[in-house]
Regions:
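Bacterial N-terminal signal peptides that target proteins for export
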Residues: 2-11
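Sec/Tat signal peptide C-region and signal peptidase I cleavage site
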Residues: 21-25
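Short, intrinsically disordered, charge-balanced linker/junction segments flanking boundaries
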Residues: 306-308
Length: 308
């Protein structure tokens, strides 16, 4: 049996608990920016539910969903979509990921929605003419993109384990993209460092994240009208809009125009997969984590076994 004291020590356990939010819970901690000179630890306690993410605005979206009666999966999916707006460095519709879910009845499951290589991918596509690795091809070119899994994964989780409709949990992200939000330290720092190196070669992205010839700065307002439209279409028409509809057509056209490999067929064929988590015993606690293709879950269990 998993001991409650252990689950409370794991940051993500609150999102996997399936509990509803209690009005008696403590207010969210002040936002802490990463990528700066100093971080401050803000302990927070709650009796029924808790939300944690890399971005305070996205975290608040999840808290609001819990307050409105949503469960942990509803909140997690809403936060994921919000991060596609507020944390474009990593959380976005064009990526993928993994999700562990522990339901109220005690079952634990894993959802794999990592990106997949396009059908036309080859083992040497990131090599230059001399056969040497070319980091630009593997990191910043259109070849670096895999078939996205985010939208499919969120939909699978929400349909099977959530309680709210898709348009409800996408709505906060849509509003953030449409109305804009204030750029924080983390995004400003990343735009200054990486945006100056990468974005000048991608005019569509530069048009969003640059203003008056330079990357957006802390305090600027970031509005993403095209992303808002995409989110609205997904909310109204479901994941098929992304994988088989207008958005899929635009992705395929962009790839073909710029040397990428993702096709409409790749997008239409993508499926998120539910898997059985790996598990291990550590000092009497049952630890669950992601199975392959994630490597981290296996390593965690191995390391804990070594420590024991």
């Amino acid at each position: 049996m998993i001991k409650p004291t252990f689950l409370r020590r794991v940051a993500i356990a609150a999102l996997l608990s399936g509990s509803c939010f209690s009005a008696a819970a403590a207010p969210p901690a002040p936002p802490v920016s990463y990528g700066v000179e100093e971080d401050v630890f803000h302990p927070v306690r709650a009796k029924q539910g808790m939300v944690a993410s890399v971005d305070a605005t996205a975290t608040q979206v999840g808290v609001d969903i819990l307050k409105e009666g949503g469960n942990a999966v509803d909140a997690a999916v809403a936060v994921g979509y919000a991060l596609a707006v507020t944390h474009p460095q990593a959380g976005n519709l064009g990526g993928g990921g993994f999700m562990l879910i522990r339901s109220k009845n005690g079952n634990t499951t894993a959802i794999d929605f990592r990106e997949m290589a396009p059908a036309k991918a080859t083992r040497d596509m990131f090599l230059d003419d001399q056969g040497n690795p070319d980091s630009k091809k593997s990191l910043t070119s259109h070849l670096a993109s895999g078939t996205p899994g985010t939208v499919a994964g969120f939909s699978l989780a929400l349909d099977k384990y959530g309680t709210m409709p898709l348009n409800k949990v996408v709505q906060p992200a849509f509003k953030l993209a449409r109305d804009g939000f204030i750029v924080n330290d983390a995004l400003a720092d990343d735009l200054k460092t990486y945006g100056s190196e990468v974005l000048p070669n991608h005019e569509n992205s530069k048009a969003i994240f640059w203003k008056e010839g330079e990357p957006l700065k802390k305090g600027d307002t970031l509005v993403q009208a095209n992303l808002a439209k995409s989110l609205e279409m997904i909310a109204e028409n479901g994941p098929d809009e992304f994988y088989k509809g207008t958005i899929a057509e635009q992705i395929a056209q962009e790839m073909q125009k710029n040397g990428g490999l993702i096709t409409k067929e790749d997008l239409a064929a993508y499926k998120a997969v539910e898997r059985t988590p790996i598990s291990g015993d550590y000092r009497g606690y049952q630890v669950y984590s992601m199975p392959p293709p994630s490597s981290g879950g296996i390593h965690i269990v191995q390391i804990l076994n070594i420590l024991e």
